Amino acid sequence: MEFLHRLGGESSREWAMRVVLQNIIHLVLPPGTSLSDKEIASFLSLSRTPVREALVLLEEMRFVDVYPQKGTFVSLLDVDDIEEGRYIRKCLESDTLIQACRSFSADGAIALEANLKMQQNALDTGDRKRFLFLDQDFHRLICSGCGRERVWSVISKNSLHFFRVRRLKIKGGGVGQGYFHEQHGELLEAILAHETDRALDILNRHLTWDVETVRASYPDYFTRDSMSKKMYMFMSEVAPVVAGAL
């Protein structure tokens, strides 16, 4: 697990939650990974109580599953969660792009151009994690450049499951980071040229790709088609008991 320094004013629970969540969405802790509150507490030099509280919150957010008698695990990817995150992002970003094409600040354009150069540097050096950060920040800068930075806060908080599978897609080598970088450049051109329809088309292509292709490459990372992992594990516990009673 990767260590993240504690932020000023951050409680022990908040810090533990941020560390575990970042490791989950960046796939340092892949879907299905066993989690130990004792080991996490030792890693962060915390007591187990705030770590347990953090895991409870992550379970509510559907990033962690707790199974009695079995343990705590990183949640498998659920297509419904992914599609919900994609939907939220497409709806809010599309509306923001319309505004950006109408009016975009000069400082915002400069910031996007600088971001694109840093993305290229990350590509050249093979720094995938850095590229993903800059990718997210590019979209935040679009929101900021048209006066809607708080919209990005809503998007980012509600599309983390989508981000996790997008990270997996890049890791798997399906659609490369160069492809996303190229689309970012096209988005900036469309915004500066006030070409709303073109910008919306680019965004649609940027966010729309088949989750099933990722699932085919990493089937063990996803929930089953008609039965979640939690139900599967529950049945694996119950079935022997029922069979023994017959």
Report residues per predicted region.
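Short alpha-helical transmembrane interface motifs in multi-pass membrane proteins
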Residues: 78-79, 166-170
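Conserved amphipathic alpha-helical segments that form helical-bundle/coiled-coil interaction surfaces
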Residues: 85, 106-168, 181-193, 197-209
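Generic intrinsically disordered, low-complexity segments enriched for polar/acidic and small residues
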Residues: 40, 60, 70, 128, ...
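Anionic, Ser/Thr-rich low-complexity intrinsically disordered regions
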Residues: 25, 177-180
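Short linear motifs at protein or domain termini
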Residues: 1-102, 107, 200, 211, ...
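Solvent-exposed loop and edge beta-strand segments that line ligand/cofactor-binding
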Residues: 171-176
